[in-house]
Amino acid sequence: MDKLQYELQGYLEIDRYRKQRFLYPLLFREYIYALAHDHGLNSSIFYEPTENLGYDNDNKSSSLIVKRLITRLHQQNHLTISVNDSRFVGPNRSFYSQTIPEGFAGIMEIPFSVRLVCSLERERIAKYQNLRSIHSIFPFLEDKLSHLYYVSDILIPYPIHLEILLQTLRTRIRDAPSLHLLRCFLHEHHNWNSLITSNKSISIFSKENQRLFLFLYNSHVYECESVLVFLRKQSSYLRSISSLAFLERTHFYGKIKHLVVTPRNDSQRTLPLWFFKEPLMHYVRYQGKSIMASRCTNLLMXKWKYYLVNFWQCHFHLWSQPGRIHINELSNHSFYFLGYLSGVRLTPWVIRSQMLENSFMIDTAIKRFDTIVPIFPLIGSLVKAKFCNVSGYPISKSVWADSSDSDIIGRFGWICRNLSHYHSGSSKKHSLCRIKYILRLSCARTLARKHKSTVRAICKRLGPKLLEEFLTEEHEIVSFILRRTRLRNERIWYLDIIRINGLVPHS
């Protein structure tokens, strides 16, 4: 066990001799701010593009402002100034709170981006700019999940205090002035501790310093997930065997499949170590959460859960409650994933087998990955947006009644198209049809409220125009490509659904 801990510590220390010690002087280089503003250094391979998360790219960086900033940095030692100093507030507050963190974030990305590019080039991975975690989610759901037994839904823990985040970052970057400046930026945002402990998406961060917060969040997640790579490499050394002598006879044949003998060295071959062979564990991260799925038993899944919780608490001082990590058996329970109720169902099939003159009817069951649109959370979102009441009865959107008819119809149609686009991966579309019906009738009631008329009169006057706005454009394109398939029951996944539907509750 001590040897394993030593190897883990050595793994976590890999590449730390390459720590960047002189990042702070780059703040005095004008080209750094140009690169940061243009999102250079291939920053899109480190995390999702910030423009997709609401980052404002319309404000052009002025070279004159940057030169004035560098001059002030030379004249004043901001690292010794309190955050509450008057020079940090007042008319120049936005100047300091946006320009400096933007350039600072670009500087902090340098060691991570260089390390990532080198590792990808070493593995000979081409077109790595297009790599996204979203690209691996849907093939995993379709190809792997139906063959697994248990799944664990995990909320990635957040640091309870920003100093813990800085200590974690200090293991990768040894530059005291830069880290002290980062501490000033974080203390300037008094609501940082409330942001890192909330369950909302990273996109809730203020737009002015969003790139810096995205970098900090991704570096934090990178450290939390580093142990998973180490454990995967360790488990690859275990070798499966056909038979073994085992003293305990309880559930003998069930346990014999998960046993392996690993000799320590040549002199200790007579004293083998007995391990349970850990089956392959699948890990997928999305929107601040992650799932772990495997073919292993419930006992081994529970061991994984408590190991991760204890590791996060002891190594990173991250508080995670074991009771909030649920282990579900896929054949009996569904889990909430990306706005879907997902699970594995046994689908009965009747197979006709012909052998010479005799035919046989064979009843069998095939595991099938199933995704269902949850109706009640979506209706709850519609109630919150005031499209219907708690019973699902459509009501008029009074705040839109002053807009033009085309604007009202366009807004409702846009919501319906996004819903159809997002939930195109559903196995059954009945719940989605009900939601679209509520929105269509709510649109008609809004128009009737505006014209002081009835819903029947509005539908008769607009005719097909009201219905056409609620048809999805991509459905027509896909139906042209896949003419021979039944699109009603076909799952079609789109890679941009994470940021499409604001009505989907992700908590």
Curated annotation (Swiss-Prot):
GO terms for biological process: mRNA processing; RNA splicing; tRNA processing. Keywords: Chloroplast, mRNA processing, Plastid, RNA-binding, tRNA processing. One of its GO terms (cellular component) is chloroplast. It comes from the Eukaryota. Belongs to the intron maturase 2 family. MatK subfamily. PANTHER family: MATURASE K. This is Maturase K. It comes from Euryale ferox. The lineage of its organism: Eukaryota, Viridiplantae, Streptophyta, Embryophyta, Tracheophyta.
